Amino acid sequence: MGRVIRNQRKGAGSIFTSHTRLRKGAAKLRTLDYAERHGYIRGVVKQIIHDPGRGAPLAKVAFRDPYKYKLREETFIANEGVYTGQFIYAGKKASLNVGNILPLGACPEGTIVSNVEEKVGDRGALGRTSGNYVIIIGHNPDENKTRVKLPSGAKKIISSDARGVIGVVAGGGRIDKPLLKAGRAFHKYKVKRNSWPKTRGVAMNPVDHPHGGGNHQHIGKASTISRGAVSGQKAGLIAARRTGLLRGTQKTAE
């Protein structure tokens, strides 16, 4: 009989440790207040920093506290084109410039925004990773709703009062450059999660994996496996509807 395979050991579970010790903090929009709902408030970009474990850079923006005589520093996801010393305007009456924070209802159709709120006041949930953005498709003023296109291509209807940052998240094209070295992959995953290196099933012995063994590396049987298979067999393409490359052009309904 074979050994307990990797995904069976995973299923038993253990306490997950997320590698967040070096992170610079949560990147969120300002808490929604009177100044943003009715006018605008001005901040200045103090510095742009790298956040370990995140592809996009962060911007430290200092705003004057509307209620106390002090400065409040916020951490935003930096958009492409944002620079230190730049003024950032946040609010309903802010201008339509890169880096400014506006409610979606105040942006014309076709505007490219990022770090968009899913629910009003949640401080940013959609289009937050490097190079990503959300496109405003249309507004419905009667219901105070806005239709947006997400980075996945999916369309979503959200409140027109939900805020977004004008522009594209910085760090685009990051995944186009290959890592090339194991050392770079090591440092990448060291600040993410313990999911690397990952030994291929065909490189194992037959006791360790259903794809293991043989005088050359080959699976030796169909790699698809049924949903009802016992856990020791569940390796490969589980309950696959189809396999192989998609051929021809694909039409997506608008």
UniProtKB/Swiss-Prot annotation:
<comment type="similarity">
    <text>Belongs to the universal ribosomal protein uL2 family.</text>
</comment>
<keyword id="KW-0687">Ribonucleoprotein</keyword>
<dbReference type="InterPro" id="IPR012340">
    <property type="entry name" value="NA-bd_OB-fold"/>
</dbReference>
<dbReference type="GO" id="GO:0022625">
    <property type="term" value="C:cytosolic large ribosomal subunit"/>
</dbReference>
<dbReference type="InterPro" id="IPR014726">
    <property type="entry name" value="Ribosomal_uL2_dom3"/>
</dbReference>
<dbReference type="InterPro" id="IPR002171">
    <property type="entry name" value="Ribosomal_uL2"/>
</dbReference>
<dbReference type="Pfam" id="PF03947">
    <property type="entry name" value="Ribosomal_L2_C"/>
</dbReference>
<dbReference type="GO" id="GO:0003735">
    <property type="term" value="F:structural constituent of ribosome"/>
</dbReference>
<dbReference type="InterPro" id="IPR022669">
    <property type="entry name" value="Ribosomal_uL2_C"/>
</dbReference>
<dbReference type="GO" id="GO:0002181">
    <property type="term" value="P:cytoplasmic translation"/>
</dbReference>
<dbReference type="GO" id="GO:0003723">
    <property type="term" value="F:RNA binding"/>
</dbReference>
<dbReference type="Pfam" id="PF00181">
    <property type="entry name" value="Ribosomal_L2"/>
</dbReference>
<dbReference type="InterPro" id="IPR022666">
    <property type="entry name" value="Ribosomal_uL2_RNA-bd_dom"/>
</dbReference>
<comment type="subunit">
    <text>Component of the large ribosomal subunit. Mature ribosomes consist of a small (40S) and a large (60S) subunit. The 40S subunit contains about 32 different proteins and 1 molecule of RNA (18S). The 60S subunit contains 45 different proteins and 3 molecules of RNA (25S, 5.8S and 5S).</text>
</comment>
<keyword id="KW-0689">Ribosomal protein</keyword>
<comment type="function">
    <text>Component of the ribosome, a large ribonucleoprotein complex responsible for the synthesis of proteins in the cell. The small ribosomal subunit (SSU) binds messenger RNAs (mRNAs) and translates the encoded message by selecting cognate aminoacyl-transfer RNA (tRNA) molecules. The large subunit (LSU) contains the ribosomal catalytic site termed the peptidyl transferase center (PTC), which catalyzes the formation of peptide bonds, thereby polymerizing the amino acids delivered by tRNAs into a polypeptide chain.</text>
</comment>
<keyword id="KW-0963">Cytoplasm</keyword>
<dbReference type="InterPro" id="IPR008991">
    <property type="entry name" value="Translation_prot_SH3-like_sf"/>
</dbReference>
<dbReference type="InterPro" id="IPR014722">
    <property type="entry name" value="Rib_uL2_dom2"/>
</dbReference>
<dbReference type="InterPro" id="IPR022671">
    <property type="entry name" value="Ribosomal_uL2_CS"/>
</dbReference>
<protein>
    <recommendedName>
        <fullName>Large ribosomal subunit protein uL2</fullName>
    </recommendedName>
</protein>
